[in-house]
Amino acid sequence: MTIGLPRAMLFYRYGALWETFFKELGCDVVISGETSRQTLCDGIKYSIDECCLPSKIYMGHVYSLIGRCDYILVPRVAGYGGKNDVCVKFNALCDIVRNTFETARVLDYNIDIAGGETELRAFLRMGLILGKSAARTLSAYRKARLAQAAEDRRKSELQEKALSRRDGMKILIVSHPYNNYDRLIGRP
């Protein structure tokens, strides 16, 4: 079984988590390519005008995965609890993808801490959908969490190293990871 990961939006925050999780479950993983002008054009074609640029890019990445995998992962995130609500696009993307690409098999998971949908619970549900036991899914999730923590440390160390350099002027750009790390919109 092959799981497609769109290289956009939350991928830049949770890519290591997702890739490790699915590989630990014995799935093949295909990640869409770096964002290109064609990715953006495809995303614009399949989006309404009012969608933000990152959402249009996301749709282009989803389009690029159709026919290349058994499922495309499209997470639904309503909120992390308390004052950690997220932009509505993270709650809506799953429905938008399903309604736009009717032939695509979407694998989703829901996170809504206030509604009792934790990340662990969501991953256990995905494992069941993929026909995996709860024990194997839990083991895969734990390994994936460790991989994501290592990736977070690596990125933090790179940022600290860049900021500690003494040569020349530094300009700090504060943005969402899906803007900063995207090759098309996050680079000069």
Q: What do these predicted ranges mean?
A:
Residues M1-P188:
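An N-terminal assembly and electron-transfer interface module characteristic of large anaerobic redox
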